[in-house]
């Protein structure tokens, strides 16, 4: 059976992430994954209090990649990342990480509510009541697929086509691109 663990990296566990990878290796785990706090729901406050800045994130990912390589493990990075801010997943060997909401994945809740991603705060329709085309072409979905929530600072950046501006729920991106309003407004 293949098992993949996922660790949300925070100030509380960043220093021990490589140790966690070693511990998991000792249990026979071959695949580990990690992400950052997502700016949705309680994650907004948590990211302010416990989120890693770009320098710390790059350091912990670099160390984690090195540890996983030494142990012959696969490390996956799930968070869409703004490369210009200092953490380039391609440079770390983690591949292109861009927002895949409404493009490669959507979330359908038990009542049929459709979200562009599992963390998106607002519905784009209901799979039990709405035509798929109205959900797929919902203005929020179209903006997400076009990476139109990215900040002005991202436009013309050398990484623009690779990262797409990172996660549109990221508070810094949302604030820059939406004048402080929520990403879906």
Model feature map: region roles:
Residues 1-119, 123-124:
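Radical SAM enzyme [4Fe-4S]-AdoMet core and its adjacent flexible, acidic
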Residues 89-90, 96, 114, 119-185:
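Flexible mid-to-C-terminal extensions adjoining Fe-S/redox cofactors in radical SAM and related proteins
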């Amino acid at each position: 059976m293949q098992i993949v663990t996922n660790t949300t990296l925070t100030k509380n566990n960043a220093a021990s992430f490589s140790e966690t990878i070693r511990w998991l290796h000792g249990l026979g785990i071959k695949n580990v994954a990690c992400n950052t706090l997502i700016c949705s729901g309680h994650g907004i406050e948590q990211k302010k209090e416990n989120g890693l800045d770009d320098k710390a994130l790059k350091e912990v990912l670099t160390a984690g990649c090195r540890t996983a390589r030494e142990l012959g493990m696969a490390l996956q990075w799930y968070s869409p990342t703004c490369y210009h801010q200092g953490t380039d997943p391609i440079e770390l060997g983690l591949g292109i990480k861009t927002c895949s909401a409404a493009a490669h994945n959507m979330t359908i809740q038990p009542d049929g509510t459709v979200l562009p991603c599992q963390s998106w705060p607002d519905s784009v329709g209901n799979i039990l009541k709405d035509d798929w085309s109205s959900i797929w072409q919902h203005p929020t979905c179209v903006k997400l697929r076009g990476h139109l929530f990215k900040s002005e600072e991202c436009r013309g950046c050398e990484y623009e086509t690779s990262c797409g501006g990172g996660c549109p729920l990221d508070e810094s991106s949302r604030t820059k691109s939406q004048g402080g309003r929520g990403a879906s407004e």
